[in-house]
């Protein structure tokens, strides 16, 4: 039960402060990876679209 409560608190806190999660800055040593990190959230969408392209290629069997 305490695990569910702590998970609920974590989710509630991330809803209250979403900007700290989505707009956190990388440390200065990793600043060269900023363009890659900005692009990374889009990558799962490509897999989702690839599934549709694949099904279209096999005629949605």
Swiss-Prot record:
Gene Ontology CC annotation, any one: photosystem II reaction center
UniProt key word Membrane: yes
Transmembrane segments: 32-52
Primary location group: plastid
UniProt membrane topology term: Single-pass membrane protein
S-S bonds: none
Chloroplast as UniProt keyword: yes
Compartment(s) where it occurs, according to its Swiss-Prot or TrEMBL record: Plastid, Chloroplast thylakoid membrane
An individual GO BP term: photosynthesis
Keywords, ordered alphabetically: Chloroplast, Membrane, Photosynthesis, Photosystem II, Plastid, Reaction center, Thylakoid, Transmembrane, Transmembrane helix
Pfam families, sorted: PsbK
Propeptide position ranges: 1-24
PANTHER family tied to this protein: PHOTOSYSTEM II REACTION CENTER PROTEIN K (PTHR35325:SF1), PTHR35325
Family the entry assigns: Belongs to the PsbK family.
Subunit structure: PSII is composed of 1 copy each of membrane proteins PsbA, PsbB, PsbC, PsbD, PsbE, PsbF, PsbH, PsbI, PsbJ, PsbK, PsbL, PsbM, PsbT, PsbX, PsbY, PsbZ, Psb30/Ycf12, at least 3 peripheral proteins of the oxygen-evolving complex and a large number of cofactors. It forms dimeric complexes.
Main function: One of the components of the core complex of photosystem II (PSII). PSII is a light-driven water:plastoquinone oxidoreductase that uses light energy to abstract electrons from H(2)O, generating O(2) and a proton gradient subsequently used for ATP formation. It consists of a core antenna complex that captures photons, and an electron transfer chain that converts photonic excitation into a charge separation.
Name of the protein this chain belongs to: Photosystem II reaction center protein K
Provenance organism: Triticum aestivum
């Amino acid at each position: 039960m305490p695990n569910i409560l702590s998970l609920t608190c974590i989710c509630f806190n991330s809803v209250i402060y979403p900007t700290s999660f989505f707009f956190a800055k990388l440390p200065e040593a990793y600043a060269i990876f900023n363009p890659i990190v900005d692009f990374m959230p889009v990558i799962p969408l490509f897999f989702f679209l690839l599934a549709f392209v694949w099904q279209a290629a096999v005629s949605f069997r």
